[in-house]
From Swiss-Prot:
This is Inositol-1-monophosphatase. It is an enzyme of class 3 (hydrolase). GO terms for biological process: inositol metabolic process; phosphatidylinositol phosphate biosynthetic process; signal transduction. Keywords: Hydrolase, Magnesium, Metal-binding. The lineage of its organism: Bacteria, Bacillati, Actinomycetota, Actinomycetes, Mycobacteriales. The gene is suhB. Mg(2+) 1 binds at E83, D104, I106. Belongs to the inositol monophosphatase superfamily. Mg(2+) 2 binds at D104, D107, D235. It catalyses: a myo-inositol phosphate + H2O = myo-inositol + phosphate.
Length: 291
């Protein structure tokens, strides 16, 4: 069966279905591959990617393969960009109105390896390099966050479907701020120095370990704001849309060129967005962080 409709709501339904199925697969495969013990998993199931601290597991690659197989059945004419399997070099250069699916089979792989229950499957549909639908499925909790352009965001869990709205906070000093760190040692040091300057101007800071979940937490009002440098498109393609459709102010990197040009992502409740950007600007936090 194929689903040819490019309507955002139809694409959202596909994203939800794919993310939900993939999350169930990840849940089962973790127990099969790593057992039920918590703590870091080792052996041949884990290897390093960009740095020794940047892991990828056999479950990442298997899950992306599952997602690609399902999309080949449902959307055979669409392009696919996956964290593990690659895809179009420039998402803005695909033919007009072509749908590109942006996949992160496990966002939060370090958490996954250590048995920390903050990792998710992220599936987004983009047209001309802009997300129009997306879903983020929390593997352990079973929640599925989703959005479609212009149609709002919601979360589905054991209690049903709830509309997502970001927080109403209007004072940066009372904001709970999320952030994350790159894998490069040099970049991490610079990010830590920036965070040390940001910490006194907000209520407190959380580091969840999954950009997709950070953005969904902004959408749900569980974080008031989030910023992170060097975020890849597959990390934020679905979550940023979900946050924006929940009312957050979202700033994304300009991606005019080859994929891999990661950049700064900011999402904040509208009442503190300007103040957050001003604080980041004051500490030179809007500039790229390079090796």
């Amino acid at each position: 069966m194929t689903v040819p409709d490019n309507d955002p709501e139809q694409l959202r339904c596909v994203a939800e279905s794919l993310a939900t199925e993939a999350a169930a697969f990840v849940r089962c495969r973790r127990a099969e591959v790593f057992g039920t013990d918590l703590g870091a998993a080792g052996g041949g199931a884990v290897r390093a990617k960009s740095t020794p601290t940047d892991p990828v597991t056999v479950v990442d690659t298997e899950t992306e393969r599952l997602l690609r197989d399902r999309l080949a059945q449902l959307r055979p004419g669409d392009s696919i960009l996956g964290e593990e399997g690659g895809g179009p070099a420039d998402l803005t250069a695909t033919p007009a109105d072509t749908v590109t699916w942006v996949l992160d089979p496990i966002d939060g792989t370090v958490n996954f390896v250590y048995g920390i229950p903050a990792y998710a499957v992220s599936v987004a549909a983009q047209v001309d390099g802009v997300s129009v639908a997306g879903a983020v499925a929390e593997v352990v909790a079973g929640r599925v966050h989703s959005a479609a352009s212009g149609l709002g965001a919601h979360v589905t869990d054991e209690y049903g479907v709830q509309v997502l709205r970001c927080s109403a906070v209007d004072d940066l000093s009372m904001a709970l701020l999320g952030t994350g760190f790159a894998y490069s040692v040099v970049r991490r040091a610079a990010q830590a120095a920036l965070l040390a300057q940001m910490l006194p101007v907000v209520r407190d800071v959380r580091r969840i370990g999954s950009a997709a979940l950070d953005l969904c937490m902004v959408a749900a009002g569980q974080l008031d704001a989030y910023y992170e440098h060097e975020v890849q498109v597959w990390d934020c393609a679905a979550g940023a849309l979900i946050a924006a459709e929940a009312g957050a102010c979202v700033q994304l990197p300009k991606r005019n060129g080859p994929v891999g040009g990661a950049g700064l992502v900011v999402a904040a409740a509208p009442g503190i967005a300007d103040a957050l950007l001003a604080a980041l600007q004051r500490f030179n936090g809007l500039a790229p962080i390079l090796d």
